[in-house]
Amino acid sequence: MKTNKLINKSFRFKQFSIEEGTCGMPISTDGVLLGSWAFSLSPTTILDIGCGTGLLSLMCAQRFPHAHITALDIEQTAYLAAEHNRQQSPWAERIECQHADILHWQPSKRFAAIICNPPYFNSGETAQHQVRATARHTISLQHQALIERLPQLLEPDGVASFILPKAEGEDFIALARQAGLFVGRYCQVQPTTDKPVHRLLFELHLSPCLPVETRLVIREQQGYSEAFCQLTRDFYLKMS
């Protein structure tokens, strides 16, 4: 019964739906935040690394009507879920799904933008289900290795957008700076006004750039904050 529920579980957004299949990463606020926040300009080519269900690819396709998107995942179950969701979407012709390991994948071109919600659990615990272990732990995609791939995948003036928990995000940024990358847009996310920052949204560049720091509070006393509603209203059904 659990397997059937997982296979049939779906999440509806305003312009598309996501079916999770047996993918290791369910729909999360992290993914919606990143897909809504990434890229202040309109990139023409986007690489979605570790695409999971294809959520970020579909969000980018909706936001950027002229973008062509490549969605990549090492897990076959994730690739199959992303491919199914691509085919069911209004933008199937602008999204290409590939089953490949980003550390060994050799694209024919570089990308104007990269989007990635990386795995981050470094606790050493191993999830019982191998698909979830691959998705949630830095087993198959170490942050250092991912950072080292960025200059090979990005165009010279390209940008890579990420979301991570605060501690892991700070470590990731430190590694990126050591590798000669530069932080541009940077947003600290708080769940509520009285709770500390728990997520970082940030963008990395290959060339020096002016850092732009902001803060986002998800919920206030009366419900979702106006800033969160404005950011996500094109996607969530109940956001007007």
Swiss-Prot record:
Keywords: Cytoplasm, Methyltransferase, S-adenosyl-L-methionine, Transferase, tRNA processing. Its EC number is 2.1.1.223. It is an enzyme of class 2 (transferase). One of its GO terms (cellular component) is cytoplasm. GO terms for molecular function: nucleic acid binding; tRNA (adenine-N6)-methyltransferase activity. It holds the Pfam family MTS. Disulfide bonds: none annotated. Its main location: cytoplasm. It is found in: Cytoplasm. The keyword S-adenosyl-L-methionine applies. It catalyses: adenosine(37) in tRNA1(Val) + S-adenosyl-L-methionine = N(6)-methyladenosine(37) in tRNA1(Val) + S-adenosyl-L-homocysteine + H(+). GO terms for biological process: methylation; tRNA processing. Belongs to the methyltransferase superfamily. tRNA (adenine-N(6)-)-methyltransferase family. Specifically methylates the adenine in position 37 of tRNA(1)(Val) (anticodon cmo5UAC). PANTHER family: TRNA1(VAL) (ADENINE(37)-N6)-METHYLTRANSFERASE. HAMAP family: tRNA_methyltr_YfiC. This is tRNA1(Val) (adenine(37)-N6)-methyltransferase. It comes from Vibrio cholerae serotype O1 (strain ATCC 39315 / El Tor Inaba N16961).
